[in-house]
Amino acid sequence: MGPVDQPLIRHDGFVEFVAEQLAPLGEVRPKRMFGGWGVYVDDVFIAIVAGDTLWLEVDDGNRADYDAAGAPAFRPFADRDTVMSYREVPADVLDDRTAIVEWARKAMEAARRSGTKPKRRVKRRSD
C-alpha cells in the first residue's frame, strides 16, 4: 500500500500530492473530516487540507516562518472570528519537497508540544 491508501476512501488529487510531499516524515494518513481532510504523520495530527490549501500546526516554535511569509491563520468559519493554531503553507514551500518536509517536521514538533495525543489503534482479537 502507498502512503495514503485506505480501503473504501477516495482521496482527491491534492490530498495525494500532500501525502507524497510529506512521505519522507513517516506514515502519512489523511482522514476525512468536516468537508476537508485531517493529515496525520505517524499518528500525529499535523495538518488540515481544505480545498486546495494545506494548513500546518503552528506554535511559538515555528510561527516566525509563517509570519515572514505572510501566511494567514486558519479560520474554520467565515462568519466568526474563530482562529485555529494552523497557518496556510505558502505555495513555494509546498512545491519544494525539502522545504515542505522541514515545515511539516516543525508542525509535528508543535503538535507534540501542544499535547495532541497520538490516536490509539484498536487491536482486533482474532478468535
What is the predicted function of each stretch?
Residues 1-127:
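Charge-dense, helix-prone N-terminal extensions
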